[in-house]
């Protein structure tokens, strides 16, 4: 997400990560949920943040793992220890793109996957996560 502006706007739109984060925080307040946004290009940092979620009372995790979706067993294994709902997010429809993007190592352990709605994928995922956490 850090270099979204350098990627194909037809796939990812033109909204910035800061704008998505602000929309998530605002929607979280509306839904009565505290939202923490985290972004890194370092796989180990994602795994460490996920491990922290295991012990800090995180009620749900939204994750857009980008290309790591297709091959990162480290991120998958970190997510697998969580007891809270996990929602996998993709701005583009990964199932309508190149064949190598169709497979997700995260999907089998996620509560659900939201893809193809651009930046709205994040907002839809937050609504789903809040609902799932309330039912858990």
Where are these regions (language model features)?
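N-terminal small/polar loop signature for handling phosphorylated ligands or for N-terminal nucleophile
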Residues: 39-63, 67-83
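Short, small-residue-biased leader/transition segments that mark boundaries at the very start
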Residues: 1-2
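Short catalytic helix/loop segments, enriched in acidic residues and glycine
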Residues: 10-29
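A generic structural motif
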Residues: 28-36
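Short, glycine-/small-residue-rich phosphate/pyrophosphate-handling segment
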Residues: 36-37, 87, 96-136
């Amino acid at each position: 997400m850090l270099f979204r502006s350098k990627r194909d706007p037809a796939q990812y739109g033109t909204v910035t990560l800061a704008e998505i984060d602000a929309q998530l925080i605002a929607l979280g307040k509306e839904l009565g949920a505290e939202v923490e946004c985290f972004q890194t290009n370092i796989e180990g940092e994602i795994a460490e943040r996920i491990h922290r979620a295991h012990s800090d009372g995180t009620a749900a995790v939204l994750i857009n793992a980008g290309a790591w979706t297709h091959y990162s067993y480290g991120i998958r294994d970190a997510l697998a220890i969580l007891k809270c709902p996990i929602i996998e997010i993709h701005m583009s429809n990964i199932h309508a793109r190149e064949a190598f993007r169709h497979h997700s190592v995260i999907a089998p352990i996620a509560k659900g996957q939201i893809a193809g709605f651009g930046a709205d994928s994040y907002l839809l995922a937050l609504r789903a996560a809040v609902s799932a956490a309330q039912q858990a």
